[in-house]
C-alpha cells in the first residue's frame, strides 16, 4: 500500500490523504489531495482566501515537483516549497507523522492484504485527527485544538 497526505503544520490535522494498492506515486492523487485539503480547510472555494499565504512543503518526489502539481498548488493559492535534496530532517513534521502513524495505527492493523489495510485507513486517519493528542497542542487532538481556537479559548498557540 502506498499513501500520501496533506497535513497542516500548525494544528497537525491530516486534511486529506490518498492510498492505493501497489508502489509508485502518480501525480494525479497528489493533485486531487491538494484540492480536497483546500476545500476541507476553507470550504468550497477556488483557492486559499486572499491575504493568507500558505506553503505546500513536500519532498522532491516526482509527483510533488511535477509541473502540473506545482501549477495547481499556485492556482489554489499555495506556495510550493520543496525540502533540500538528501535532507529528510528538513521535512521533520511529515517524517514524525509517518513514524507515529506506523507505530500507533499500522502496527495494530490487520495486514493480511492491501484491501484489508485500505479498509482500515479511514478510521485510523479520523482517530488521529479527532483523538490523538499532540504535545505541541498541549495534549489536545488536532480537531480539539481547532474547535478551541474557533471559540477563542486559547490564543496562546495561535498559528500564523
Functional labels for PLM-detected ranges:
Residues 11-14:
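Hydrophobic "anchor" residues
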Residues 19, 55-60, 75-93, 109-114:
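RNase H-like polynucleotidyl transferase catalytic core
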Residues 34, 69-70:
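Distinct, well-ordered alpha-helical segments
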Residues 74-78, 100-160:
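C-terminal domain-tail junction helix/linker
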Residues 46-65, 84-86, 91, 139-143:
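Acidic/histidine-rich, metal-coordinating catalytic segments
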Residues 7, 18-48:
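Active-site beta-loop-alpha junctions of metal-dependent nucleic acid enzymes
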Residues 1-4:
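Short loop/turn microsegments at loop-to-beta-strand junctions
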Amino acid at each position: 500500500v502506498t499513501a500520501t497526505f496533506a497535513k497542516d503544520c500548525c494544528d497537525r490535522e491530516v486534511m486529506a490523504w490518498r492510498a492505493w494498492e501497489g508502489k509508485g506515486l502518480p501525480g494525479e492523487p497528489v493533485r486531487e489531495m491538494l484540492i480536497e485539503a483546500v476545500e476541507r480547510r476553507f470550504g468550497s472555494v477556488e483557492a486559499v482566501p486572499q491575504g493568507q499565504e500558505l506553503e505546500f512543503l513536500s519532498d522532491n518526489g516526482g509527483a510533488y515537483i511535477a509541473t502540473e502539481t506545482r501549477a495547481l498548488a499556485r492556482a489554489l493559492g499555495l506556495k510550493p516549497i520543496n525540502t533540500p535534496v538528501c535532507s529528510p530532517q528538513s521535512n521533520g513534521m511529515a517524517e514524525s507523522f509517518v513514524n507515529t502513524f506506523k507505530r500507533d495505527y499500522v502496527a495494530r492493523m490487520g495486514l493480511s492484504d492491501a484491501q484489508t489495510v485500505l479498509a482500515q485507513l479511514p478510521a485510523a486517519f479520523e482517530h488521529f485527527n479527532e483523538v490523538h493528542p499532540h504535545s505541541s497542542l498541549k495534549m489536545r487532538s488536532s480537531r480539539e485544538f481547532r474547535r478551541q481556537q474557533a471559540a477563542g479559548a486559547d490564543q496562546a498557540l495561535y498559528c500564523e
